[in-house]
């Protein structure tokens, strides 16, 4: 009997602390399980989902995220990271991108729900070419109209400067050279380095945006209800 009591005591002494410790190992978050340490301060930092070609929560869009995306492109003389926050109350579906010069290594995010933001990048063509990253992207909105965003990061800053623009077109309209020329030359393009606010004139929407002035350009735009 005495041997049984000693055995029971040793069993309980070993098993009880282990059982309590396990309660701190697994924490549920939604439908996922994350393995954590007992000390919450030692939890691993979550990896950011902010990569070019992705859609993130609109509230997360900031210039520092665009800086991170630019760093991932590498050493290219002319490049741009674009973030467009959809606070329009509408769903956006990608149409296309037209390039006056340059290209992109990522696909334009296909769907952007309300309260989400799209991330996109463009760069000058590879090789020793004196070209910039210049073009326009287009999204069809659930209202039936088209949202167009023009961006221009020129190669020669002696003659040109960074410009951007936004316009809502009636109906579905794919980006092309005509759209680019209109937004660059005839629709009051926006200069860099200052925050711009503008009524877009359709669907009860307005914009708020900012573009940096250097060759590693960042363009952040919020499309909101007026």
From Swiss-Prot:
Stretches for region Plays an important role in the hemolytic activity: 50-59
Note on domains (UniProt): Composed of a long N-terminal alpha-helix and a core region rich in beta-sheet structures. Before the pore formation, the alpha-helix binds the lipid membrane, partitions into the lipid-water interface and stabilizes the monomeric molecule on the membrane. Finally, it traverses the bilayer, thus forming the transmembrane pore.
Source organism: Actineria villosa (Okinawan sea anemone)
Keyword field contains Acyltransferase: no
Record function comment: Pore-forming protein that forms cations-selective hydrophilic pores of around 1 nm and causes cytolysis. Pore formation is a multi-step process that involves specific recognition of membrane sphingomyelin (but neither cholesterol nor phosphatidylcholine) using aromatic rich region and adjacent phosphocholine (POC) binding site, firm binding to the membrane (mainly driven by hydrophobic interactions) accompanied by the transfer of the N-terminal region to the lipid-water interface and finally pore formation after oligomerization of monomers.
Signal peptide interval: 1-21
Protein family: Belongs to the actinoporin family. Sea anemone subfamily.
Keywords: Cleavage on pair of basic residues, Cytolysis, Ion transport, Membrane, Nematocyst, Secreted, Signal, Target cell membrane, Target membrane, Toxin, Transmembrane, Transport
Keyword Metal-binding: no
GO CC annotation terms, alphabetical: extracellular region; nematocyst; other organism cell membrane; pore complex
GO biological process: cytolysis in another organism; monoatomic cation transport; pore complex assembly
GO molecular function terms noted in the UniProt entry: channel activity; toxin activity
Propeptide segment residues: 22-45
UniProt name for this protein: DELTA-thalatoxin-Avl1a
Record-listed phosphocholine binding positions: 101, 134, 152, 154, 180, 184
Principal cellular location given in the protein's record: secreted
Residues annotated as site: Important in the initial contact with the lipid membrane: 160
């Amino acid at each position: 009997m005495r041997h049984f009591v000693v055995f029971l005591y040793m069993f309980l002494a070993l098993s009880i602390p282990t059982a309590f410790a396990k309660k701190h190992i697994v924490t549920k978050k939604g439908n996922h399980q994350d393995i954590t340490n007992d000390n919450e301060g030692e939890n691993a930092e979550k990896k950011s989902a902010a990569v070019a070609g992705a859609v993130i929560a609109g509230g997360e869009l900031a210039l520092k995220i665009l800086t991170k995306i630019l760093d991932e492109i590498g050493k290219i003389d002319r490049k741009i990271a674009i973030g467009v926050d959809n606070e329009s109350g509408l769903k956006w579906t990608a149409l296309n991108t037209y390039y006056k010069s340059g290209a992109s290594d990522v696909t334009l995010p296909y769907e952007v729900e309300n309260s989400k933001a799209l991330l996109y990048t463009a760069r000058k063509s590879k090789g020793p070419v004196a070209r910039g990253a210049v073009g326009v992207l287009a999204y069809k909105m659930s209202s039936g109209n088209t949202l167009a965003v023009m961006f221009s990061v020129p190669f020669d800053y002696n003659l040109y400067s960074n410009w951007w623009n936004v316009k809502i077109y009636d109906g579905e309209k794919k980006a092309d050279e005509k759209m680019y020329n209109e937004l660059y030359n005839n629709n009051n393009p926006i200069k860099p380095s200052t925050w711009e606010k503008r009524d877009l004139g359709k669907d009860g929407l307005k914009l708020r945006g900012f573009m940096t002035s250097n060759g590693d350009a960042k363009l952040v735009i919020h499309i909101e209800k007026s």
